[in-house]
């Protein structure tokens, strides 16, 4: 379907008495901006932009330079001097802002965490009043498993993508330093075969089963997870899977929402450098884990999709709507019993 056909189809639906309530945008990479503007010019629907990474700030979506966070604030010649991404990112920002300024009266930016909002809004302070936070998941109940393990051996895991910016290199450094100690068993959870002796690979693919990783962490009684993301994670499903399995999380202070949640929930330790991580395993990791298990700071029994997403559906007047508020002239109604149909635009598939 091309842009013209889509507009004709939506007009036909409107003619039958329906109404396009809202448009949800989940990514701007490779988006046909002209097609998007043609659609928004035709329809007065509310626009919700879901920010899942920092690609609208910089085309280097991790915002890492030489393995370190670039810093808060707007991109500028002074801040980004010598960066290969600067010129293209500045061009993109100018194009985005032209569109956003035109839509200001019906636009809302939705973030999965306060951390993500803080980083993004520091680059776009003029839109901060159009921002809100809706986490991807809700934590339900209490999981009481994996807290009574009195074994003298700790199960230590790396979880998910083995990219350097996710901390795989640091995990291997830790493994190589500690691998001969009988106090640790080493695990990798994901889709790869890491090919490293004494690292047990547990195949997990959440694409086949969304609960696969959580179940695997619980079944294997993982004690410690090294979540050493170098970038400011906007959310981190992996963290919440660890939280729900009562796993002690060790993370870097620059890991974004991972570090924020560890400090908030008290289910791990935030350290300042890889050197501090190595020292922790040399000296006090066992005491830290046993103290955590003794305090029984339980994680959730269930992780459910957050139905607050329904707040981003502008409903008609429904007698069973249970709440309404106005943000930026947008009527936000919340009704957990009713799933409103969402028009989810996949702009990369649109052609001129």
Regions found by a protein language model. Give the residues of each.
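Short N-terminal targeting/anchoring amphipathic segment
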Residues: 13-32, 45-50, 224-227
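Membrane-proximal helix-turn-helix segments that form the acceptor-binding/catalytic region
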Residues: 71-109
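Helix-loop-beta element that forms the nucleotide-linked donor phosphate-binding surface
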Residues: 101-108, 117-139
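Conserved donor-binding/catalytic core segment of Leloir-type glycosyltransferases
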Residues: 110, 148-166, 172-175
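Acidic anion/phosphate-binding donor-loop and adjacent secondary structure
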Residues: 137-153
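Nucleotide-activated donor-binding/catalytic signature segment of Leloir-type glycosyltransferases, i.e.
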Residues: 188-221
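Short alpha-helical segment that forms part of, or immediately flanks, the ligand-binding pocket
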Residues: 214-215, 238-245, 259-260
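Nucleotide-sugar-dependent
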Residues: 226-238, 253, 259-260
